[in-house]
Amino acid sequence: MNKQQLASKIWESANKMRSKIEANEYKDYILGFMFYKFLSDKEVKWLKENDWTDEYLQDLTEDDAETLDTVRKNVGYFIAYDNLFSTWISKGSDFKADDVTVALQAFSRLIDPHHKKVFDGVFATLQTGLSKLGESSGARTKAIRDLIYLIKDIPMDGKQDYDVLGFIYEYLISNFAANAGKKAGEFYTPHEVSLLMSEIVAYHLKDREEIKIYDPTSGSGSLLINIGQCAARYMGNGNNIKYYAQELKENTYNLTRMNLVMRGILPDNIVTRNGDTLEEDWPYFEENDPVNTYDPLFVDAVVSNPPYSQAWNPNDKENNPRFSDYGLAPKGKADYAFLLHDLYHIRNDGIVTIVLPHGVLFRGGEEGTIRKNLIDHNNIDAIIGLPANIFFGTGIPTIIMVLRKNKKDSDVLIIDASKGFEKDGKNNKLRACDIKRIVDAYKERPDKIEKFARRVSRAEIVQNDYNLNIPRYVDSSEKAESWDIYASMFGGIPEAELQDLSAYWTAFPHLKAALFSSDNEAYCHLNVQNLKNAVLNHPDVVAFKTAFQNAFGDFDAYLKSALIDGMTQLNAAGEEERLSWEIFARLAGIPLVDRYAAYQLLDDDWKKIAIDLEIIQTEGFAATKQVDPNMVLKKDAEVQDGWVGHVLPFELVQSVKMHEEVAALRAKETRLAEIAGEYESYLDELSEEDKEQDFVNDSAFVAAEVKKAIKAREVEPATLSILKDVDVLFAEEKTLKKKVKDDSAALHQRTKSVIEHLTDEEVRDLLHRKWILPLMENLNSLPDAVLDDFVKQLDAVCKKYETTFEDVESQIADTEHELLGLLDDLQGNEFDMKGIAELKKLLGGE
């Protein structure tokens, strides 16, 4: 299984296993056991690298003081053989819940003193929560055994596995968050928002060799990790990043530490604290000697997603250096207190990205004063309005604010990104194209992007009384539908409404004149019969499609060279960005095609390509010719059900290498479907009396009873004829079903063999079909999508005034006249005729 499949399997099982335990609580147990496995496997790996064999491992006890000391100094902790995760697994039915209790107590006792801050108390939430996994010792043992068996297959023993482990950890956290309701906000920032903030920060820090990053409300730590990963792409050395984190809630603080350690971050680069960020600021100090170890923390970047509009205590904080130059946030809303905390802790050339409720942009009082001071101090770099319902557990409209200390320009970039998203269950989610559009706008800082972004001067903000509400500066609303009164009365197409399609007329300069004839300076009429054909066959439109085809004519070969020929060497993390630059460059001279729509197509395919590249680069090219057992759950047990391609899907290989066998099998399956239809037809021919006979049951023929009825010959001749035909169908169906089953099994086995014996060139061809052909097909569809949308809009304008009010009035008059004629023919009693006479008056008949 790839990491996506493994993560999905673990989540599905874990969600079933948690039963009545809240998702918010259960996550602490499964993630805690994952972390213990990671630490256990890491120690075993270090020991084996230092000549310990499996046999020697059994002698690993804390009674061996020399070994204990060596392991603690090198690994940061010590786990005895009896307490190793692998030992728990090997115990099988002898494993007991108490084994975990003993192991966790021993771990806490045997942490290396130099690593206390990283590991001390990290399993506290798991230890206290074990009792909730079952009411009896036996129930707890079963629940824990199920949990450790669930995660035993997660790889944790090599550099490449940090990504797999981290992916699964993030996947589980995000899914638990989706099921945790309002509590999700305590520990999780959606990955897409985290990625957006990370890209902005990493761009700002791209030229630095060493950086420090800090999250004062760290939650699960995912936001910090994403920043680190993005920054490492520019820096090249992830070990030159130091991570600082503070979190108020103990269980969430433990998630932060686990997540950072499991991503392969060096313990010396992790500095975390469990505390109240607003009450206990971070001049860093050792608890046992606060005066002599006082060290104010200033970092390159602060990122945070603090609790929204949280109550806090501003008393006696007027002279606190974090707030003294700006003011104190109101006690009922700590949003600006968190922001000022973040701003204080960056270096003069640092950057802050913080998620806040949009009310901070326009609320008055103390918040208005702070906002004014931030503008006057030139600290606000950008404001990004996010879509509604983007965070788990809250529908509050939110923004990302970007802040800096020594900003050279005095304007503020305001981006309204509230319209760009996709639905994901109950929530909205940023797409890859939405993130890139925002990040590109931040990097390029244009004067204006219509309905999306604008650079606003400080003078304009001051003129608006320091109100930063986004709609004041960027109008992203759609144009309201309007109706032209003249065209509604007399017909014709308003030139003003055609002008709304000006981008198309610019791209196709001669098209408008070919489609429309002018009635006067303000109105025109359509002079072609088939609008779509007239548009698509016009020379300007043909030239547009040809230009696109020329721009991407050799892109297939380009992709083949980049991805297929270079699959073992390319940097997968940076390749998508390089390909996006190439696509954007090719689209530079092509009007109308949205480059971000093209980027989304690339990203959709890249997710699949990246998984394959990761496998090939970590396991070798031979992995492409590998098949794996297809494991499925049957009656709570995992059993094998055939095989699946490790990289190459069976369906792809069959369509290319075994199309004749596949076609023959599909023909048999088609015939089976036809037989089912023929049964229905024969049933329809039966009388209702026949349908009550034993040879029909639940609207289906019964094979054995059909034979009996034929043999007895007690039915009508027509019915007997039907039954004989049905009996023949039963025989054919039985033969076909066996044949389909046998042929399917044979095809499956042959596909396995074909994959295992592919030549390298055949593999490259199949990868080309899997990776490149779908992307090319999607990209080549972009011009057609543009033209379809254009024709749809144009057709709507043309049809809008096709029927005038005069036409409607005429139709009404004709209908009334017709109705009057019908009323004249009606007969009835005295009262009926009086009613009809009155109706005729209303219709103008008298």
Predicted stretch roles:
Residues 1-201, 271, 277, 385-388, ...:
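Non-catalytic, mostly N-terminal accessory regions of nucleic-acid modification and defense proteins
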Residues 9-10, 16, 22-38, 330-403, ...:
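Conserved Class I SAM-dependent methyltransferase catalytic core
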Residues 36, 220, 250-251, 278-279, ...:
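Conserved nucleotide-binding/hydrolysis micro-motifs of P-loop NTPases
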Residues 37-50, 54, 176, 205, ...:
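A generic secondary-structure signal for well-formed alpha-helical elements
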Residues 183-304, 309-313, 320-326, 330-332, ...:
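Conserved S-adenosyl-L-methionine
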Residues 400-441:
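Conserved P-loop NTPase
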Residues 433, 437, 441-451, 456:
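Eukaryote-biased recognition of long, low-complexity, charge-rich segments
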